């Protein structure tokens, strides 16, 4: 009997030690994640802040600057302030999705209406970029979800395609549905992305083309928000290069939250 008691105590002790090691590793991983995120945020903030400061310093140091030059520097500062505002907003969204998911309430929503609203809001940029967007989302496609996050899913993916594909032809489709889930595809006619990048494009601050991404005004958080928003709706998302060319996002959304 004493032998079994000793064995039992030993097993409990081993389990306790293993759990403590596991928790330590988890806490270390979280701390490393927070540190990396802080470093990335600091790095991303430097560019717009430096640009704004540089433009304003130039104006202050040259009070006799002609009006046209002054206007150009003011416009540059204004554009960078917009980028800074977008970055702060995206960081806030990511933080809420990480720690305050109850912040986002769910309602019965029509996905057709949401997609139409996204297309309307992107219409000017779509025209300026020479892009075309078509969709086959049926009317009255109801889902229990959060409007802001569902809007972000479609907006951020389309925004990426418009930014990085010349004269993009983008297609949005409801590819399948069952009693529990809706399945979507958003594809473009661009060159796709390197295969090794496919596994990373939903990571925070990951950029396939760093120079072009910053030039386009991206925050590096758009697709990470997409992934978090899909997970919030009990779905999954992947990106694949199409055989015929272009990038395709395939994702699912639960009709009703669990």
Predicted regions and their residues:
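Short acidic helix/loop segment immediately C-terminal to the autophosphorylated histidine
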Residues: 60-67
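Conserved micro-motifs of the catalytic ATP-binding
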Residues: 99-104, 142-145
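Short helix-loop "hinge" at the ATP-lid/N-box region of the Bergerat-fold HATPase_c
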Residues: 161-162
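Conserved glycine-rich
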Residues: 168, 234-235
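Short conserved segment of the HATPase_c
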Residues: 193-207
């Amino acid at each position: 009997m004493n032998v079994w008691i000793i064995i039992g105590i030993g097993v409990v002790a081993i389990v306790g030690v293993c759990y403590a090691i596991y928790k330590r590793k988890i806490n270390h991983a979280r701390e490393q994640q927070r540190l990396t995120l802080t470093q990335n945020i600091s790095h991303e903030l430097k560019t717009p802040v430096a640009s704004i400061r540089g433009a304003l310093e130039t104006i202050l140091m040259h009070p006799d600057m002609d009006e046209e030059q002054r206007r150009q520097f003011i416009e540059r500062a204004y554009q960078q302030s917009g980028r800074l505002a977008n970055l702060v907003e995206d960081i806030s969204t990511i933080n809420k999705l990480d720690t305050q998911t109850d912040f986002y309430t769910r309602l019965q929503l029509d996905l057709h209406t949401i997609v139409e609203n996204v297309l309307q809001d992107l219409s000017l940029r779509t025209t300026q970029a020479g892009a075309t967007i078509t969709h086959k989302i049926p009317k009255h496609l109801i889902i229990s979800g959060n409007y802001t996050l569902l809007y972000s899913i479609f907006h951020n993916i389309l925004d990426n395609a418009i930014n990085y594909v010349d004269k993009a032809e983008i297609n949005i489709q409801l590819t399948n549905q069952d009693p529990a889930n809706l399945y979507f595809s958003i594809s473009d006619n661009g060159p796709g992305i390197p295969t090794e990048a496919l596994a990373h494009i939903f990571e925070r601050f990951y950029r396939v083309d760093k120079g072009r991404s910053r030039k386009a005004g991206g925050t590096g958080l758009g697709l990470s928000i997409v992934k978090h928003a899909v997970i919030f709706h009990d779905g999954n998302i992947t990106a694949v290069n199409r055989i015929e060319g272009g990038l395709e996002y395939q994702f699912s959304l639960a009709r009703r939250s669990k």
